[in-house]
Amino acid sequence: MGFRLSHLSLALSFVALALAGVAIYRNTYEAIIMNNGSLLQNASPHFDSLESGVASILTLNNKKRNSDMYLRQQLTPEACVFSAVRGVVDSAIDAETRMGASLIRLHFHDCFVDGCDGGILLDDINGTFTGEQNSPPNANSARGYEVIAQAKQSVIDTCPNISVSCADILAIAARDSVAKLGGQTYNVALGRSDARTANFTGALTQLPAPFDNLTVQIQKFNDKNFTLREMVALAGAHTVGFARCSTVCTSGNVNPAAQLQCNCSATLTDSDLQQLDTTPTMFDKVYYDNLNNNQGIMFSDQVLTGDATTAGFVTDYSNDVSVFLGDFAAAMIKMGDLPPSAGAQLEIRDVCSRVNPTSVASM
């Protein structure tokens, strides 16, 4: 009798477990139908039963939970690259909002010196190679190199068999920074190459400086085939970010009318920063509003209002942010197309901070 009761108890336990399993299945089944009803309705001709449809939906949902690496590998080559770079840039800006402005500036400083060739990314090598990073316009100022290195590695890891230059990655990072900070996105075409050289002197002579008067600025932008309107639009990059006090808040570099805005220590150390407009983390038109009120921080910015033509563009952008954002995006596309110097040795770098050991990818 006891033996039979034991078997009966065991049987009842199995029944209870089975019923619990049915309940769990039903709850899961109903939840899946609720969340994927349209999928199941549309898919019914392809399944032997609704249960097999649920099983297929479960498989799809499991795939959704796979890593970003897996998802990116399902994209087209260009889409994979854009996704990989954007993930790194977004994380960097989330960690430090200022990084967005730094990446935009890094792209500008790359393209304005012998074209968009990734030259600014090359590290100095003691005694054998002098790059652009320690040229006065960039020394202790240009930043974001590590973000570009991380983005390059992300592309390598998640987009196998796709060769993308460091110059391309820098262009994408700048575009994504503009969008992340509230600006207008724009198309970035791929296909740039990386230079095997850099130009220390070119960084000093070709880049606009905070003490440049309007005539000098016009000449530097004209040398790159930019119009006056495009010059004023690109200056709008100063609507985000900060600059070193030692650079912008010294005599000759600062707009005298705005000098009281400089929030710097008496020693003007490199760690002292001055915001370039009153909303330094937002890609907006406040930079132009400040110029119209004679409150631009840098001398080179405020002189844009000293000429009737350039002052008119400042007013246009101050009056309508959408006009500024559209013109800025168009000017960035044009800048991103500046070609490397004629005769430059080019490649696709494996590591952005150094040239390849042998120029297997020379172009």
Curated annotation (Swiss-Prot):
Coiled coil: none
GO cellular component: extracellular region
Keywords: Calcium, Disulfide bond, Glycoprotein, Heme, Hydrogen peroxide, Iron, Metal-binding, Oxidoreductase, Peroxidase, Secreted, Signal
Annotated EC: 1.11.1.7
Signal peptide: 1-20
Catalytic reaction list: 2 a phenolic donor + H2O2 = 2 a phenolic radical donor + 2 H2O
Cellular localisation: Secreted
Cited PROSITE patterns: PEROXIDASE_1, PEROXIDASE_2, PEROXIDASE_4
Active site feature: H109
Disulfide cysteine pairs (residue numbers): C80-C159, C111-C116, C166-C352, C245-C264
Binding site residues for substrate: P208
Residues annotated to bind Ca(2+) 1: D110, V113, G115, D117
Annotated binding of heme b, by residue: H238
GO biological process: hydrogen peroxide catabolic process; response to oxidative stress
Residues bearing carbohydrate: N36, N126, N161, N199, N213, N225, N263
Cofactor(s) for this UniProt protein: Ca(2+); heme b
Binding site for Ca(2+) 2: T239, D277, T279, D284
Cofactor note: Binds 2 calcium ions per subunit. Binds 1 heme b (iron(II)-protoporphyrin IX) group per subunit.
Site (Transition state stabilizer): R105
Entry's induction text: During wound-healing and by factors which induce suberization.
GO molecular function: heme binding; lactoperoxidase activity; metal ion binding
Entry similarity comment: Belongs to the peroxidase family. Classical plant (class III) peroxidase subfamily.
PANTHER family, per the entry: PEROXIDASE 59, PEROXIDASE 72-RELATED
Function: Removal of H(2)O(2), oxidation of toxic reductants, biosynthesis and degradation of lignin, suberization, auxin catabolism, response to environmental stresses such as wounding, pathogen attack and oxidative stress. These functions might be dependent on each isozyme/isoform in each plant tissue. Suggested to catalyze the deposition of the aromatic residues of suberin on the cell wall and thus play a role in cell-suberization.
Name of the protein described by the UniProt record: Suberization-associated anionic peroxidase
Native organism taxonomy: Eukaryota, Viridiplantae, Streptophyta, Embryophyta, Tracheophyta
